[in-house]
Regions:
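A hydrophobic, multi-pass inner-membrane permease signature
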Residues: 1-249
């Protein structure tokens, strides 16, 4: 909590107070950093871009990740999940150049599609690994009974499995949202002035000779608000989803 508190307090400090040493806990608060943030940047446009990219990549990541997690749980074949985890653990710079070339050849550099697709690839492994314990916790007898009654794989996923893994689905959605919302590298390289997201726009306050720490902390505070508010709103499902499948037997 200390870094978050320091970030929020610094957003209300003047430039002199932010860089003062030793740090001051008592200072005259100012809204100048927020006024500078909204006065010099199209902050609301960047927020709209972030919402479009994050919502699109979260939905796409769920559409791809939920059936994949269900298939891995149903078949007990673990290598696809291990492969996606290995891809997720690889540094983003490993994929940056080939993805940039691919999207440039497709004419998608600077478009929402480039950001949505790359962020969906980033969030899908998270969705798979969060939902695997939830699907594994469903009794096999329930799924077998659904198959006996004529439910196919997709229908049993939609009608039987998904209602039983609601908390896990909430956790997967939140984590996918947070990962996409906060991802910096591809948002910086694949966007342009019209599609730049908040996390990439905040980098504008970092200069070669100096950094506008007050405006940067104000931007960081506002960027951190949506994930925090979302997690607080669904805290009950978040806790149960994280613990689901942790204890068996």
């Amino acid at each position: 909590m200390a870094p978050l508190a320091w970030m929020v307090l610094s957003s209300f400090k003047s430039s002199a107070d932010v860089t003062a040493y030793p740090p001051t806990l008592v200072f005259p608060p100012t809204l100048g950093n927020y006024a500078h943030l909204f006065g010099t940047t199209p902050f609301l446009a960047y927020a709209r871009n972030s919402l479009i990219v994050t919502a699109g990549s979260t939905v796409l990541g769920l559409l791809l990740g939920v059936p994949a997690a269900y298939a891995v749980s149903l078949t007990r074949v673990t290598w696809p999940a291990l492969l996606t985890l290995a891809a997720r653990m690889a540094p983003g710079t490993l994929f940056l150049l080939p993805w940039y070339v691919m999207f440039r050849e497709a004419g998608l550099i600077g478009s929402y599609w480039a950001l949505v697709l790359t962020h969906a690839v980033i969030t899908m492994p998270v969705v798979i690994w969060v939902l695997l314990p939830s699907f594994d916790a469903i009794p096999r007898s329930v799924l077998e009974a659904a198959q006996v009654d004529g439910c196919g794989v997709l229908r049993s996923l939609w009608r039987i499995a998904l209602p039983l893994v609601g908390p896990g689905l909430v956790v997967a959605s939140i984590l996918a949202f947070v990962f996409s919302w906060n991802y910096f590298l591809f948002a910086l390289v694949l966007s342009n002035a019209d599609t730049k997201t908040l996390i990439a726009a905040a980098f504008n306050f970092v200069g070669e000779g100096s950094t506008d720490w007050g405006a940067l902390m104000a931007a960081a505070t506002l960027i951190a608000l949506p994930p925090l508010l979302l997690a607080a709103a669904v805290q009950r499902w978040l806790v149960s989803g994280l613990t689901l499948g942790a204890v068996k037997g």
